[in-house]
Amino acid sequence: MSNLSVNAIRFLGIDAINKANSGHPGVVMGAAPMAYSLFTKQLHINPAQPNWINRDRFILSAGHGSMLLYALLHLSGFEDVSMDEIKSFRQWGSKTPGHPEFGHTAGIDATTGPLGQGISTATGFAQAERFLAAKYNREGYNIFDHYTYVICGDGDLMEGVSSEAASYAGLQKLDKLVVLYDSNDINLDGETKDSFTESVRDRYNAYGWHTALVENGTDLEAIHAAIETAKASGKPSLIEVKTVIGYGSPNKQGTNAVHGAPLGADETASTRQALGWDYEPFEIPEQVYADFKEHVADRGASAYQAWTKLVADYKEAHPELAAEVEAIIDGRDPVEVTPADFPALENGFSQATRNSSQDALNVVAAKLPTFLGGSADLAHSNMTYIKTDGLQDDANRLNRNIQFGVREFAMGTILNGMALHGGLRVYGGTFFVFSDYVKAAVRLSALQGLPVTYVFTHDSIAVGEDGPTHEPVEHLAGLRAMPNLNVFRPADARETQAAWYLAVTSEKTPTALVLTRQNLTVEDGTDFDKVAKGAYVVYENAADFDTILIATGSEVNLAVSAAKELASQGEKIRVVSMPSTDVFDKQDAAYKEEILPNAVRRRVAVEMGASQNWYKYVGLDGAVLGIDTFGASAPAPKVLAEYGFTVENLVKVVRNLK
C-alpha cells in the first residue's frame, strides 16, 4: 500500500508538470517517500481545519518542488487542492502556483521558493511554539504542543541564511524543529561535488543540532525511526536522507536533467513502466485516497477533537488565561493596544526618534503580553529592549527580548516564522544601512501579508563620523518601491508613537520604522492621529499659500525652520510632514488635493536620501533637496552643511524656484 501511495505522489507531480510544461519533477520523485512517511506517520494536521493553531507545521523549504506539497495536500483531502487545481498547476488564477504561497492555498504554512528562507522561517515557528507553550500551557493542559517539520535540499543549505538560522536554533535548543535534508548530490548546474562538498552533518553537529543519516531514501521504516529518535533528542534535528533525484526515470534519474524540466511524454512512459504505474495521467487509485484519509485526515481530525476538548477544560480551569488563548485561536491579539495607551508629549520636547521608539515599544510591551522581538546585536543602539524582561533562551522561555546576534537576514526570516505561526506581534532591529541584509526577508513579510515591524535606526548621513558605509542613501527609495510595505520616517516623538501604534495594529502589512540617532524637537504642528493619513499639514502661515515644502523625519524640523525664515521674508508657505509615502498614496483623491493642491506648483521636497521618488509629488516645476551620491565621514553638522541640509540652503532652493 505504501509503495502505491508513494508512486501516486510521484505521478501526480510528473503529470501536472508535464501538463504545465514547466516545473521541477526531480525533487517530487526523489523526496516522495520521506514526505509520505512524514505526512502519514508524524504530522498532526486536519484538512477540515487547515488553520488549527496547534497543528504541526510543514515547510517545504525546497519550494521549487511545490508539486510534492500539492500532491500531498490533494491526497490528504484539502479542498483547495482539487484534481482540477492539480491539472491547473502554474496557471493563472490557480491554487497551485509555481511556488507555495501562504494565504493563497489552504494547507500552505509558509511561502517558499527563495532558497534558505524556508528552513530559516521554520526556526521562527519553533520559537513561537516554545514561547506560547511557556506562556499558556499549564500542568495537564498542553494547549500549544506541536512540531515544525521541514524538507530542504542542498541549495537551501548552501544559502548563508540557513547557516545563520541553524546556528541560532542550536543555541536556542529549539528541539521541536525537525529538518529532513533531501541529499541527492545534484543541483541545477550539475553535481554538488563541484560546488558543495563539506560534511553538512558535521557542521550541524557543531551548531548544537542532533543529526542522523538515512542511507536509503526509499526506506520508510528507517525514515520514521530517524524522526522518532530526533524528536526525543532534546535538540533541533537534521536528518540527512540520501535520495536519487528523479527516482524511477530510467534515463534522467540521478542527473540535473530532471531537476527543472518536465520529463516529457517518452520518459514519462518509461518511468511508468519502470515503477509499475499502470494508471492514466491524473488517475489515482481509490485505495491511495483511503490510505491518506485514514493516516492523515482521520488521524488529524481525532487529534483536533481531543485538543478542542482540552481547550474547553482549560477554560474551566484557567479562565483568565483562556480568554487570551481564545483570542489567539481566533487570530486576534489577546489585548488591544489603543492610542490612549501612549502618553501625551509636550511641544518642544527633544529626543532622537530611536529613543522615542523605545519608549513607544515599551508602552506596547506593557500592554500586550504576546509582543516580543529584538535586534541583530544592536539592541542598545536600535533601542529595541523591553525593559521589564531579560533575554529569551531555553532556560528563560518567557522573556521577550531576543538576541538574534549579527544575523540580520535570519532575524527577518525568524520573525516571519513567528508571525506566520500566529498569536504573536514581533519586531526586529538593525541599522538602516543594513536593511539590505534583511531585505529578502522583508519582501516575504510583505508578500505573505505579515505585520512584522522592522526597526531601522541611524537613518541618514547624520550618522556622521561612521561615514558612507553606515550612511543610508538609496534605502528609503528601495523599501518604498516594495508592494505592501508601510515605511514610516517619523518627524518626532509624537509621530513615532503613532507609527508604532499603526504598526502593532496592522493586520496584513509589515512596517519599517526609519529612525534617527540625533535629537529631534517635537513640533507644535505634529499630530498623532493624522499620521494615519501618511501626510498632513504641520505649518502654514497663510491660507493663500503659494509654496509647499514636503519633508520626512529629521527634515521636518529643518523645513519648518526654513518656512518660518521664508515667512519673515514675506513668503506664503505650507509645510507638509509626510511620514509615510506608502500610506499617503492610499488616500483618496480629495485628501491628496487637500494636502497638496494641484494649483500650487511651487514645491520642494526635502529628505536625506535618494531624490528619485519625490518627483511624483513636486512635479517638473518643483525641486528636491536630496542625496544622490554616497555620504562622507565627518562630524554630523559638517556633513549636513556640505550636503546642503541647512536652513540657509533650503531657503535658497525655495527662492530659486519661479
Curated annotation (Swiss-Prot):
Ranges that cross the membrane? none
The entry's Mg(2+)-binding residues are 154, 184, 186
GO molecular function (one)? metal ion binding
Q: Which domain of life is it from?
A: Bacteria
Query: Keyword Metal-binding: yes or no?
Result: yes
Q: Does the keyword Transferase apply?
A: yes
What reaction is this protein's catalytic activity?
D-sedoheptulose 7-phosphate + D-glyceraldehyde 3-phosphate = aldehydo-D-ribose 5-phosphate + D-xylulose 5-phosphate
Q: Which UniProt keywords apply?
A: Calcium, DNA recombination, Magnesium, Metal-binding, Thiamine pyrophosphate, Transferase
Any matching Pfam family = Transketolase_N
Q: What do we know about how this protein assembles, alone or with others? A: Homodimer.
Role noted for this protein = Necessary for high-efficiency recombination chromosomal DNA during genetic transformation. Catalyzes the transfer of a two-carbon ketol group from a ketose donor to an aldose acceptor, via a covalent intermediate with the cofactor thiamine pyrophosphate.
**What family does this belong to?**
Belongs to the transketolase family.
What protein name is recorded for this chain?
Probable transketolase
According to its UniProt entry, this protein's organism is Streptococcus pneumoniae serotype 4 (strain ATCC BAA-334 / TIGR4)
Q: Which gene encodes it?
A: tkt
